[in-house]
Curated annotation (Swiss-Prot):
Superkingdom classification of source: Bacteria
Keywords: Cell membrane, Membrane, Transmembrane, Transmembrane helix
Lipid bilayer topology: Multi-pass membrane protein
Name of the protein in question: UPF0316 protein CLJ_B0679
Record PANTHER family: UPF0316 PROTEIN YEBE (PTHR40060:SF1)
Statement: the UniProt record of this protein carries the keyword Transmembrane: yes
Transmembrane in keyword set: yes
Gene Ontology CC annotation, any one: plasma membrane
Ranges that cross the membrane: 1-21, 36-56
Family in the record: Belongs to the UPF0316 family.
Compartment(s) of residence: Cell membrane
Length: 170
């Protein structure tokens, strides 16, 4: 009986983790991969759900194990998605004029595409650096900015599509 509960638990974790990844893939424009994962996901769901429901009155622990698997699956899906880092992002950096030029050079030396535009702060002129990059490079770019000893305001946004640009083609 314990192995049956383990099967329900781990199959549900796998199914929900796949659901999370499928959702992310589809929202990022990866329809084919999302559809393939969806097929696997629904196959697991049908098998697990039917096996839980077929004897739920006699063995209500199945329901608890199923719910625990669902909960852990959500967490695992988020962890896996974070590691895969599928997609693109935009990092906006606002800093002083002189620091902006220096930071742009530092980033460009690391093969990061940077567009620099003039910006107006409350007290002084600023530079805004606009960086479009793969999500996999997020931590590297943020560490580079923070490690440069330049006072900067950083914002990061996930984006769906970028056309053209430096260093972000698939």
């Amino acid at each position: 009986m314990l192995s049956y509960y383990a099967f329900i638990f781990f199959a549900k974790i796998m199914e929900v983790a796949l659901m999370t990844i499928r959702t992310v893939l589809i929202t990022r424009g990866e329809k084919l991969y999302g559809s393939i994962i969806g097929f696997i996901e629904v196959t697991i769901w049908l098998y697990v759900t039917s096996s839980v429901l077929s004897g739920i009155k006699d063995d209500p622990i199945r329901m608890v194990v199923y719910a625990l698997g669902f909960t852990c699956g959500n967490y695992m899906g988020c962890v896996i998605e974070e590691k895969l880092a599928i997609g693109l992002l935009t990092i906006n950096v606002i800093t002083s004029e002189s620091d902006g030029k220096r930071l742009a050079e530092i980033l460009r030396d690391k093969n990061v595409g940077v567009t620099m535009v003039d910006a107006e702060g409350k007290i002084e002129q600023k530079k805004m650096l606009i960086i479009h990059a793969k999500r996999k490079r997020r931590e590297e770019i943020i560490r580079t900015i923070e490690g440069s000893d330049i006072n900067a305001m950083i914002s990061v946004n996930d984006i769906k599509t970028v056309y053209g640009g430096y260093g972000i083609r698939k």
